[in-house]
Swiss-Prot record:
One of its GO terms (cellular component) is membrane. The chain crosses the membrane at residues 27-47. The gene is trbI. Residues 99-122 have a biased composition (Basic and acidic residues). This is Probable conjugal transfer protein TrbI. It comes from the Bacteria. Residues 95-122, 161-189 are annotated as: Disordered. InterPro entries: T4SS_VirB10/TraB/TrbI, T4SS_VirB10/TrbI. NCBIfam families: PRK13831.1. It is a single-pass membrane protein. Keywords: Conjugation, Membrane, Plasmid, Transmembrane, Transmembrane helix. Belongs to the TrbI/VirB10 family.
């Protein structure tokens, strides 16, 4: 019973034996720190109130009498009596003396622009004098011009040769008599020198832009003189003769491209006989033609000019035919087959430039300022528009200046037009 009643007391005793008491060392350390802090604060406040400048007599003399302090303040200053303040007189301006001044007439400035804008009308005498002066000046200038022209003509005449070479004139009648021509043809050519000189003199004035006068001269150059013809009938010189106006049918062997100049060859496609009888074979089928073409093609041109210079026979002999023109199968001058005008490149470049310029113009922000102000965006937009406009114009102009390309394919049938009489030694024989 007794043991059961002490069960709780035993537990408490065990708890008291297992409890750890608080150590007093931290409390002492905290008290020391607080004391040190308070001591430092007190010492600092005390030092702030102490004087540091011991040499200053005024501040250090706390026990000195007030009389000595006053003497120290007025040290070096002599004794004096302070009198009454001096009265200052108020500033009064000196009166100005009135002088009699003569009144000058007032000049009113009036605008002179209307007077300058309105020209002063000339009198009749001044007008006549001015006209006479201008007339005299023109007369003097014209006289000076005529005088200088006479001096220049005289100098040219003095520098000209004194001999005239008439050897060419003597050779011309001999050649005309040898070929059966009349010497009057030379006289007609000499009579045309003056009109030719007049035309060459006024050529720079561009009085005939369509060249109508040259067309009339071309049409009437052989019928200027009425009556008999100056030339006589020339008899046939050989039975193996091919007259002018005849044609030589041929077929093109090599192709033709007008981008670059070059040489071409062809082959005679039919036998060619003499012009008088038509029975003597002069040029056999299979003979070769050698020629050249003109690569200078202008804008809008569809035909290319071809000339033939050599005729090579199957037996190996060669005949130089000078430069006879080639015509197509229908008789038109030049060759025509395929023409490339490069329109796709021209219009595609123009469309591309337009699209680029439109895109850049649309990408720029619109200006919200007044019309009189110029912002950076407006300047950029304007510069881009001008730059692309110039680029587009130059690109299109360059593409327009590109000449069209004319292509003549191999196998093209044409004719060689004989423009001079050809005399063969004999009928063709294959040796």
């Amino acid at each position: 019973m007794v043991q059961s009643l002490r069960l709780g007391a035993a537990n408490e005793a065990e708890d008291q034996n297992g409890m750890r008491r608080l150590n007093r060392l931290p409390i002492i350390v905290a008290i020391v720190i607080v004391a040190l802090f308070v001591g430092f604060v007190v010492i600092g406040l005390a030092w702030r109130g102490l004087p540091f400048n011991r040499n200053n007599d005024i501040h250090s003399a706390s026990n000195t009498p007030a009389t000595n302090f006053g003497d120290q303040l007025k040290r070096g200053v002599t004794d004096g009596i302070i009198g009454e303040p001096v009265k200052r007189e108020a500033f009064q301006p000196t009166p100005t003396m009135k002088q009699k001044v003569d009144k000058e007439p007032t000049v009113v400035d009036r605008p002179t622009e209307p007077e300058e804008r309105r020209p002063r009308l000339e009198t009749e005498e001044e007008w006549k004098a001015r006209l006479m002066r201008e007339q005299d000046e023109q007369i003097i200038r014209e006289a000076q011009r005529q005088r200088m022209a006479r001096l220049q003509a005289r100098a040219t005449a003095l520098d000209s040769p004194l001999k005239v070479d008439i050897s060419e004139g003597e050779k011309a009648p001999k050649n005309s008599t040898d070929t059966g021509q009349n010497p009057t043809a030379t006289e007609n050519n000499a009579s045309d020198l003056y009109p030719a000189a007049m035309k060459s003199g006024i050529m720079g004035e561009n009085l005939d832009p369509n060249a109508q006068a040259s067309k009339e001269d071309f049409f009437n150059q052989d019928i200027k003189d009425d009556g008999y013809l100056p030339n006589r009938v020339v008899p046939q010189m050989s039975v193996y003769e091919l007259k002018r106006g005849s044609v030589i049918p041929a077929t093109l062997i090599t192709g033709l491209n007008s981008d670059l100049p070059g040489r071409i060859t062809a082959q005679v496609s039919q036998n060619v006989y003499d012009s008088a009888t038509g029975y003597r074979l002069l040029i056999p089928q299979g003979a070769k033609l050698f020629g050249r073409y003109d690569s200078k093609v202008s804008f809008g041109q569809e035909r290319v000019l071809v000339v033939w210079t050599d005729l090579i026979f199957p037996n190996g002999s060669t005949l130089q035919i000078g430069g006879m023109a080639g015509t197509d199968a229908e008789g038109y001058g030049g060759f025509k087959d395929r023409v490339d005008r490069h329109l796709w490149r021209t219009w595609s470049s123009a469309a591309l430039i337009a699209l680029i310029g439109t895109g850049i113009d649309m990408s720029m922000p619109e200006s919200s300022t007044l019309a009189t102000q110029d912002t950076a965006s407006d300047a950029v937009r304007r510069n881009f528009a001008e730059s692309f406009g110039r680029v587009a114009e130059q690109t299109i102009s360059k593409n327009l200046n590109v000449q069209p390309t004319i292509r003549i394919r191999p196998g093209y049938k044409f004719n060689v037009l004989v423009d001079q009489d050809i005399i063969f030694p004999s009928a063709y024989r294959d040796n």
